[in-house]
Each structure stands twice: as C-alpha cells, then as structure tokens.
A protein has these predicted regions:
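Mature, function-bearing regions of proteins
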Residues: 1-149, 153-319
C-alpha cells in the first residue's frame, strides 16, 4: 500500500466532486460549514493530537465502523426495538445516517459549546423514547446501561474499522481512544464506559449471551446495501463495505446474532477496501469537518495528515 502519511493528489475536477458529495452527505439540510469553522479558536471536547481526531477524519472508516456498531446495537433487543420503533431509519435511512454521522463528528470536532448544546438536545430526546422491547422488557433510551452499550459499540466500530482497513493502531493508541471517549459518554448519560481495550473485551464477553438474532439486524443490512450513500458509480461497493463491517465484529458475537462467516470478504475484496481506506485517509478535503476544525484552531489543513511518530509502528499483514 502507499504510505498513508503522504497526501493524495487527484485531478482538481474530481477533488471538487468528492468535496461536494462529502458536504451533501454530512450536511443534508444545507447547514453551513460554520458548524465546525466557528467560533474561531474555540476548542473541541478533544484536542487535535487525540487518537479520536486521527480516526474520525476518515469518512470510509466511519461508514464501515458505523455499520458494525449499529449491527451490535440492534442485536440488543431493547436498543433494537427503540431504534426501529421510534426513529425514521426504515422510512428515510439516508437522512437518519446523515444526522447520526453529523452528531458523531460534532462530538469529536465541533466547538465545545455547540457540541455540548447538541448532546443536551439528544439526551432530552432520549428521555421521551420508552416502550416494550421484542423480548418483553420495558426500555427507555436514557437508561445508562443501554447508553453504555451504544457508546461502547460505536467506539469499537470506528476503532476496528480504522485498524482493519486504514492503518493498524498500536495497543496504547487503542486504549487512548477508549479513554478519550469518556467525557463525551458522560455528557450523553452513560455512567460506566470501557476506558481500555481490555475493558471493552470484558463488556463484550458479558453481553455475548444477551444479544439475539433479529430480523431487525437483517433488515438493516439490506437497507445499507441499497441506501444511496455513495455516488452512483460507486454504489455497488456498498455491498463490500457492509461485508467489511460485519467482518470486524468478533466471531463469537457474529455467530450469536446469526451472521457467521458467509458474509466475509474475499481476499481481493479486502485489499480493495483497504486501498479505498488508505486513499480516504490521505485525501485532504475542505468540506471534511476534521479539516474545518483544524482551520478553526488556526492549524494547517493537512495537520491530521502529517507524519506522526507511531504511524508506521505496526505494518499491515492482511494485504
């Protein structure tokens, strides 16, 4: 693979098209770039040297990781029932994905005041989401136990997608990523969240028997294969990205929810996804919230794309 630390240069016309598509994907309602550009100088919940800023800059990794996270979330009966009963995911999946993606990026890159305001609005909404799950248990979206699972699976998905398809991460980076996420998790209402890779694995071990095979999961995967998230010429790749997401889920959890290995990537497909992930990690786009956050803090556009001491510490072995 190419050195991921070297900025990718593509023809200007193509660069503009990619920027425009990313802007539409992240801001479907036409909201302004000032979400991340202003107020000038205001810090985010996390600093630009964080592992989170490194990982969240990659839109392909976020897409793959987001699918993996939602699969695990929907397999928990209370979370799955809440999402399917109280959101517009089935009717307007792309709009739902766009809002969720924007919220995740605001949490990481947005100015602290706006991020906290957005999170407060989300928590108020969660208070109103109550019902009976498919397994007969009552649920509320503000339940700290459910928020912990949603937060942990989101962190897991984004981290593992980046590690598998973009750039391998050292153990210290993985632990840092989980510990960095703690302040935002508390704001969302999660009282106890994994702060290390070991803690995440322990949570997964406890949850393994509580996840269920669900038609909701399979409906979600069918939607993700069809939703027009990519430009029309690239939409056939969504099947591969969905497979890539399933593949990062631990085998024990995957088997327990009925996904098995039938949806695994072929070796050539894995190489293709890795090449795409590498390219996305080296393409500096002015519409990327990561770049806009750097501008807000008076940092160069390519700050997150410059070499770091540990970038080449772990060679990839699956390509």
């Amino acid at each position: 693979m190419n050195d991921p630390r070297i900025e990718l240069r593509i023809p200007r016309w193509l660069h503009h098209k990619v920027e425009a598509h990313l802007a539409h994907l992240l801001r479907p309602d036409g909201s302004a770039d000032e979400d991340f550009l202003e107020p000038r100088g205001e810090p985010a919940l996390l600093g630009p040297d964080s592992v989170s800023w490194k990982i969240f800059k990659n839109p392909l990794g976020l897409y793959i990781g987001g699918i993996a996270a939602v699969v695990l979330q929907l397999a928990e009966p209370r979370v799955g029932s809440g999402v399917w009963q109280y959101t517009t995911f089935r009717q307007r999946p792309l709009e739902r994905l766009q809002r969720t993606g924007h919220a995740a990026l605001m949490t990481v890159y947005g100015p602290r005041s706006r991020a906290e305001q957005m999170i407060a609005a989300v928590t108020r909404l969660h208070e109103r989401v109550r019902g009976i799950a498919s397994d007969g248990r009552a649920f509320c979206a503000s339940d700290p136990e459910l928020l912990e699972w949603v937060h942990a699976t989101a962190c897991f998905g984004f981290l593992e997608a980046y590690h598998a398809y973009v750039q391998p991460l050292a153990a210290l980076e993985r632990d840092r990523f989980y510990s960095e996420s703690r302040p935002a998790a508390v704001l969302y209402g999660a009282r106890s969240t994994p702060e290390s890779q070991a803690a995440l694995e322990a949570l997964f071990a406890r949850m393994c028997g509580q996840l269920q095979r669900s038609d909701i999961v399979f409906d979600f995967l069918r939607i993700m294969r069809r939703v027009p998230a990519l430009p029309v010429p690239l939409q056939p790749l969504q099947v591969l990205l969905t497979k890539a997401a399933i593949e990062v889920i631990p085998a024990a959890l995957r088997d327990g929810i009925g996904l098995g290995t039938a949806r695994s990537l072929a070796p050539w497909q894995r190489r293709l996804v890795c090449h795409a992930g590498d390219a996305a990690d080296r393409l500096v786009l002015s519409t990327n919230p990561a770049v806009q956050a750097c501008r807000r803090l008076h940092l160069p556009d390519d700050f997150l794309y410059a070499p770091r001491p540990n970038d080449s510490a772990m060679p990839r072995t699956n390509q």
